[in-house]
């Protein structure tokens, strides 16, 4: 048994935005008056701005986790860059010409599943992570209509209506959609080998809001957020 060590080096990141109140106030007022379909309403304009900014940052972090590159401003190396640099070439498959679609998705996912070592297959934390377009193609392929050997009406005879945002699996391996993944990408990995690190976890949801009206008379709001983030792959 050989043990190795890898280190996560989180990158310092920050958000420094200037937002005009007018750009957000209409939607905030509608929410505060109860026109929103959501039950949890922002009790103050400041909390609305914090929620708005945090949601945007969360989307960017999700993309960074999969596709980020440390050389780009506001990014750290994601699993795509790390896997290319660290994994043996035999473990990396070329993307299918023309991209993944409902006609080839079963074969392409089969290649990924077949590459999983027998010692790893069946582990409870093994997943196939796929991009949104791959998941969409897989759902459509399982809808059938005489395609892909699934008969005229696919799973349970429901056609393309069979899927209602439930769980997916392939060859007994759970399938997870990585919202930040680029099109046509798939990874087979144990969740316990995929790491995201940050200095303090609550740093990723702490936002400072400065109302500039008392300082310069403008209708601007300055939003400041500082945090660290980085990824690493265990083997």
Q: Would you name each region that the model predicts?
A:
Residues 27-28, 61-62, 137-139:
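Short helix/loop capping segments that flank catalytic or ligand/cofactor-binding pockets
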């Amino acid at each position: 048994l050989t043990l190795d060590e890898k280190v996560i080096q989180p990158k310092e990141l920050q958000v420094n935005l200037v937002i005009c109140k007018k750009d957000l106030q209409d939607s905030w007022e509608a929410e505060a008056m109860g026109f929103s379909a959501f039950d949890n309403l922002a009790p103050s304009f400041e909390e609305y701005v914090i929620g708005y900014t945090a949601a945007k940052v969360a989307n960017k972090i999700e993309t960074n986790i999969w596709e980020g590159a440390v050389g780009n401003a506001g990014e750290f190396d994601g699993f795509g860059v790390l896997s290319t640099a660290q994994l043996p070439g035999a473990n990396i498959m070329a993307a299918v010409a023309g991209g993944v679609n409902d006609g080839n998705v079963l074969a392409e996912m089969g290649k990924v599943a077949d590459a999983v070592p027998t010692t790893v297959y069946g582990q409870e934390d093994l997943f196939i992570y796929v991009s949104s377009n791959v998941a969409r193609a897989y759902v459509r392929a399982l809808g059938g209509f005489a395609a892909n050997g699934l008969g005229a009406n696919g799973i349970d005879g429901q056609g393309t209506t069979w899927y209602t945002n439930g769980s997916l699996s392939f060859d007994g391996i759970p399938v997870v959609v990585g919202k930040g993944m680029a099109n046509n990408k798939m990874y087979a990995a144990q969740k316990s080998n995929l790491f995201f690190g940050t200095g303090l976890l609550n740093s990723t949801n702490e936002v400072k809001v400065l109302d500039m009206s008392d300082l310069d008379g403008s209708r601007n709001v300055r939003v400041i957020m500082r945090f660290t983030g980085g990824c690493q792959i265990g083997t």
